[in-house]
């Protein structure tokens, strides 16, 4: 089992816009165990999308499927306009 966290550093004041995009897209992705997190302390304007995947092949399939769906593309349209930078963390669950 893997936990994948996509960490987005939003442009100042734009985290809410990014949250709105993901909140619109999440219901379209049924069967995906995912969470949407925001900073409480630390770096301002940080949004984290956390996804649980059985293995890395399943995660790669999720990315491919998500990227090919027009409804998800429409929901996420323009979200990169609100992003300054980002990175991905991948963790293997051991207990």
Positions of PLM-derived features:
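Short S/T/G/P-rich N-terminal loop/turn motif that feeds into the first structured element of a domain
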Residues: 1-72, 78-95
């Amino acid at each position: 089992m893997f936990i994948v966290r996509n960490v987005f550093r939003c442009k100042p004041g734009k985290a809410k816009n990014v949250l709105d995009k993901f909140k619109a897209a999440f219901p379209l992705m049924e069967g995906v165990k995912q969470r949407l997190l925001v900073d409480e302390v630390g770096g301002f304007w940080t949004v984290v999308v956390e996804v649980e995947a059985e293995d890395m092949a399943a995660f790669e399939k999720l990315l491919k499927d998500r990227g090919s769906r027009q409804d998800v593309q429409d929901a996420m349209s323009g979200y990169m306009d609100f992003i300054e930078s980002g990175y991905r963390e991948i963790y293997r669950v051991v207990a």
